[in-house]
Amino acid sequence: MKNKLPPFIEIYRALIATPSISATEEALDQSNADLITLLADWFKDLGFNVEVQPVPGTRNKFNMLASCGQGAGGLLLAGHTDTVPFDDGRWTRDPFTLTEHDGKLYGLGTADMKGFFAFILDALRDVDVTKLAKPLYILATADEETSMAGARYFAETTALRPDCAIIGEPTSLQPVRAHKGHISNAIRIQGQSGHSSDPARGVNAIELMHDAIGHILQLRDNLKERYHYDAFTVPYPTLNLGHIHGGDASNRICACCELHMDIRPLPGMTLNELNGLLNDALAPVSERWPGRLTVDELHPPIPGYECPPNHKLVEVVEKLLGAKTEVVNYCTEAPFIQTLCPTLVLGPGSINQAHQPDEYLETRFIKPTRELITQVIHHFCWH
């Protein structure tokens, strides 16, 4: 029953008060089960059918799919339930207590992105879901902040094919139709240790890595020359050398050296293509020193994403907002949802607040976000 649904601000408060941190470090990682239960109960109260999906390979994490209406197509509204960890020493407020001050709602997940579910639930108060002409789906995913395991698993297993989807990440209500991907690798070189007084008796891994880095930087230049997408502020794939470590003493021949690097590919570039380019770049080192160089993923890769600029979803949202779609450099779950249907990234709050101490969402987003959600539901599910 709709009258059982708490007021908007109390929904928001309950979501923020329910910790659901994702972290690669097991001691910090938390289940999102309690948050999923909250959402599931509220959507059931609104007349939705609810399915809770355990996500394999995670520490007790779940997706939730709430659905209402019959037939094919329809609209999917999606978002993630998890947050990043927080630095207790840098927050001036309790991260798990929603605090309103000076036109801002403070709390961990207010912008990125638990608040989106509060907006959806509040907008649905005024929607008669029994009269939907096409189905409406609400997807809440797990582990976006680490592996994106929830969105990956949902996209791999669902039979749903909505007409379109909106992911409510904080874009300041500016619609995003494309973003770059992310690939991170560890390059490891195994040398042979020995006393530095006789270099010929060992194989110095740092020297081999120096050779490998030269080839990697040549790949960086080749990517910049070969691939372009002018809509991006940085209109080519970037390659960054982010971390390196090797050796343990100045008088020992270095036995092992490890380099961490990332590539941010443009939409349309395949992960297999990029892996092939990296392997080709490192081939001279591998051929000269067989068995000493390995390449491993640091995190599951995220492909680039693009929604066709002439799709109906783009046209409708641009008309409703009076704003053109944009492209951005950060990553979301959009590449995985895009395998099901055309997808936009669009939500309240600023990406500049994501992952920051004293995270907040400005209250000026409340009214236009509620109106936008109502409008897109009416457009894609009532006609």
UniProtKB/Swiss-Prot annotation:
It is an enzyme of class 3 (hydrolase). It comes from the Bacteria. Its cofactor is Zn(2+); Co(2+); glutathione. Zn(2+) 1 binds at residues 80, 112, 169. The active site is at residues 82, 144. Its EC number is 3.5.1.16. Catalyzes the hydrolysis of the amide bond of N(2)-acetylated L-amino acids. Cleaves the acetyl group from N-acetyl-L-ornithine to form L-ornithine, an intermediate in L-arginine biosynthesis pathway, and a branchpoint in the synthesis of polyamines. Belongs to the peptidase M20A family. ArgE subfamily. This is Acetylornithine deacetylase. The gene is argE.
